[in-house]
């Protein structure tokens, strides 16, 4: 069985909307897009902590899972950037599963596979069909739906020292009992923590 791991950048007030760029996701009148970028550019150790930390604590690669919007934004950017970086290498090497309701979806990047239908059902089937970690990047609506269905097993949260005061929050109404698996603090004070979801 796959383990589903949500990897997110969050503010101190729990916002995860549009961390990378000003035009990434302006829905709801959000004007703080790109809020995480200055912190992570100034602290490369923090920018990769979710992945280096997971590797150091025995992560088992199984693939990546995206909502359709995040797939287009994230994969499109990181697979076209000309700057060498380890994240692009991880993306290229990983199978990429995309939850979508569009039966005619065309996915632009190699090793990309559509999960067509209702995400809770398609992801639940995928979860039962393999092993290793399925890492969800961003994809806030997908993560919240999966959490409500009890399908998220772990969260790796990189918490940045900023309060945004607006924007979509990662956790929205689903109570969770979490256990810290590991935590690391970068030189600039950015904290990355992996939490396991405790099941009843």
Outline where the language-model segments fall:
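Enzymes that bind and transform nitrogen-containing heteroaromatic metabolites
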Residues: 1-200
């Amino acid at each position: 069985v796959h383990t589903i791991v949500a990897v997110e950048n969050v503010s101190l007030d729990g916002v995860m909307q549009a961390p990378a760029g000003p035009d990434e996701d302006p829905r709801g009148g959000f004007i703080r897009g790109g809020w995480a970028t200055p912190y992570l550019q100034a602290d490369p150790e923090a920018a990769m902590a979710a992945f280096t930390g997971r590797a150091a604590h025995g992560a088992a690669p199984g693939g990546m899972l995206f909502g359709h919007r995040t797939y287009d934004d994230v994969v499109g950017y990181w697979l076209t950037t000309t700057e060498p970086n380890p994240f692009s290498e991880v993306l290229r090497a990983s199978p990429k599963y995309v939850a979508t309701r569009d039966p005619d979806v065309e996915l632009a990047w190699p090793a990309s596979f559509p999960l067509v239908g209702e995400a809770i059902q398609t992801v639940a089937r995928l979860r039962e069909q393999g092993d290793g970690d399925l890492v969800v990047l961003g994809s806030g609506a997908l993560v919240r739906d999966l959490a409500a269905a009890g399908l998220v097993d772990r969260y790796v949260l990189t918490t940045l020292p900023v309060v945004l005061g607006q924007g979509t929050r990662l956790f929205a109404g689903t109570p969770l009992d979490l256990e810290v698996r590991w935590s690391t603090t970068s030189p600039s004070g950015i904290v990355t923590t992996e939490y396991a979801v405790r099941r009843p």
